[in-house]
Curated annotation (Swiss-Prot):
This is DNA topoisomerase 3. GO terms for molecular function: DNA binding; DNA topoisomerase activity; DNA topoisomerase type I (single strand cut, ATP-independent) activity; RNA topoisomerase activity. GO terms for cellular component: nucleus; RecQ family helicase-topoisomerase III complex. GO terms for biological process: DNA recombination; DNA repair; DNA topological change; double-strand break repair via homologous recombination; mitotic sister chromatid cohesion; reciprocal meiotic recombination; regulation of DNA recombination; telomere maintenance via recombination. It comes from Saccharomyces cerevisiae (strain ATCC 204508 / S288c). The active site is at Y356.
Amino acid sequence: MKVLCVAEKNSIAKAVSQILGGGRSTSRDSGYMYVKNYDFMFSGFPFARNGANCEVTMTSVAGHLTGIDFSHDSHGWGKCAIQELFDAPLNEIMNNNQKKIASNIKREARNADYLMIWTDCDREGEYIGWEIWQEAKRGNRLIQNDQVYRAVFSHLERQHILNAARNPSRLDMKSVHAVGTRIEIDLRAGVTFTRLLTETLRNKLRNQATMTKDGAKHRGGNKNDSQVVSYGTCQFPTLGFVVDRFERIRNFVPEEFWYIQLVVENKDNGGTTTFQWDRGHLFDRLSVLTFYETCIETAGNVAQVVDLKSKPTTKYRPLPLTTVELQKNCARYLRLNAKQSLDAAEKLYQKGFISYPRTETDTFPHAMDLKSLVEKQAQLDQLAAGGRTAWASYAASLLQPENTSNNNKFKFPRSGSHDDKAHPPIHPIVSLGPEANVSPVERRVYEYVARHFLACCSEDAKGQSMTLVLDWAVERFSASGLVVLERNFLDVYPWARWETTKQLPRLEMNALVDIAKAEMKAGTTAPPKPMTESELILLMDTNGIGTDATIAEHIDKIQVRNYVRSEKVGKETYLQPTTLGVSLVHGFEAIGLEDSFAKPFQRREMEQDLKKICEGHASKTDVVKDIVEKYRKYWHKTNACKNTLLQVYDRVKASM
């Protein structure tokens, strides 16, 4: 019996073939230099009679095998009215490399009895699996539904891969239809509005250095003119968040405020403690002055202790790691942009160091053996000449026997509220020694993943919080302090700050306290800071713009399109909109479409429709028809208001 297995990337095909073939696979050329065919024998497929030994060929694609586009001859740039593209037929297309990969799949499928898909286990992976199946059928029409299986896996640990081969499922056609829906809508909306915007703004921008140079790469782009103003259903809401912050800063009007502050000497250590006014601050100077003078006249420099609290407090360990948290925290802590961190995580996954990095799940299944993963972090790396990671001793301490003095023992991670039912949270699979073949960025991302995982498997940090409340005449002031008693997870997770503060004065209830200093102070409200990538990731995730796996791509695209640029200020990197980016957002706002392109609502509704398709509550045909009709209506209104876009561009350019 012959089985053809196809992975999404050659690195996965190579790793899986080594495991299933017991290290005895042989490789041969596929016709495309970056894809190999791996041949081996394997027994254990459930469809093989009595678990018989099967001849297996493992190969791969390189991402999507096909694309869709309009016919260049009839619907290329300038060859048709733009609005015709809302109804124009779509053709399946392949570039030269995809054709070579497709030929290999057809050739290998000719003698195959079964096809097993080993693409990534997400929505996009299901669609790529379907593309593979369609190509395999062209090589062997006998490969129908019953002959197609789908391996379900989330990392490249040996036993996990063997279980995936022995317990396959079927392709999820609902997910396939959802991705097909998204691809068609993005193409029709993207090309129609890209051509309209480009033709409208081309003359304005022809000599501007602010234009992107990738027109030939963008579907629907004009190969003869790189001055393309592209539209994307996710990129515009992403741009909208950045422009909104920019305008809040630009239009900010500072306000002066006033407040009262007390300082009390701490006789135990010779220091001082500052007590903050419970009213915070007020914007009326006369009111604050009245409170201040009343207190001085009534109580002088004496306050009274009216409340004294001391209670245990906890700093919770982090929840298990999702894709969004990985990108957000790598941007915040490691100064890596979302694309850098996700690309590094992908490579670590392909090399077998971490689990699949595209997941919304923040809950580990209770049946999962996490202690064995902690043990691997504690082990010496045999390939690294006895080298240990900086956190190996911490991992070992989590596994110490119960009768040791260490209170920080292994504890099953907290459970979040998300479970995509496809992949567990991101976690390390094997330890990474000093000599591992990884880049510096990959090593930093691995360290973050490993430390985050160990923090999840640790005890919460424990401390004692104290609050001291004083009455100064009719006004109340308070000071708080913290003593950290057990650091626990903080010892392995340096990005969480929780430190012991200055000791509060030791005072008794109702005691009278001499005030060393009582001041009425002034301050000024400050504008928000420019948008950071970490903040943008959180906003996109909260508002349903893109998926955990595509957020990085959308942020990258608005910079490639030159709608946004990154600026480094000190250690922080901020995102600032360009003149073109601001004018596009304000231009569409001035046109007044029913659903603003720069707001998240329209794309969020589309993501909800795609989810309904995945759940079987909506069909591809209905969703495509409904959303394309909306875009058709918006296109006609935009086309009728083209001059508005030009006027807004001039206005924005003059103001910046």
